[in-house]
Amino acid sequence: MKIAGFVKNSFVDYPGKISSVVFTQGCNMNCWYCHNRHLIPLEATHDEDGNTSPYYDSEAIIGLLKTRRKIIDGVVISGGEPTLQPGLESFVKSLKEAGLNVKLDTNGTNPGLLSRLIDAGMLDYVAMDIKAPIDKYAEICGKHM
């Protein structure tokens, strides 16, 4: 997985829980109001000096999260759009095997993967961002629905 950001402690991202937040790189929308615009490109962007944003190692993040089980109640996977990540299912499985609650923030554009994760009992909370009325998606999100 392309993990482009990590927050050790959040009291606001998972209602009623203390969580860590993992931010994935890449989104299939281009919402003009996005507060994580640097995560929209499928690859990390370069800063003014030409440096690429580093990705976090997924296994290292899982290891760190396992050590924080007594501090956090769960993990939020956000982005970008997490369901674009090829390694999402195995990442979530590792978190569940570690006894952590998992919240997924998604734009809902990958319903097949979302259904698989829900049906497998791998998600404890799903926050689906409905961005606009269906007839306004192209204008607001840069994508027809």
Residue ranges and their predicted role:
Residues M1-F23, N30-G50, T67-K70:
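N-terminal [4Fe-4S]-dependent radical SAM core
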Residues S20-F23, C27, D57-I61:
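Short N-terminal amphipathic alpha-helix/helix-capping patch enriched in small hydrophobics
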Residues G26, H38, I130-I134:
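Short, small-residue-rich loop/turn micro-motifs
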Residues C27, C31-C34, L95, L104:
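Hydrophobic packing within well-folded, soluble alpha/beta domains
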Residues L39-E59, G80-P86, Y137-M145:
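Conserved non-cysteine loop/helix-boundary elements of the Radical SAM core domain that shape
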Residues I62-G74, T83-M145:
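Conserved AdoMet/S-adenosylmethionine-binding subsite of the radical SAM
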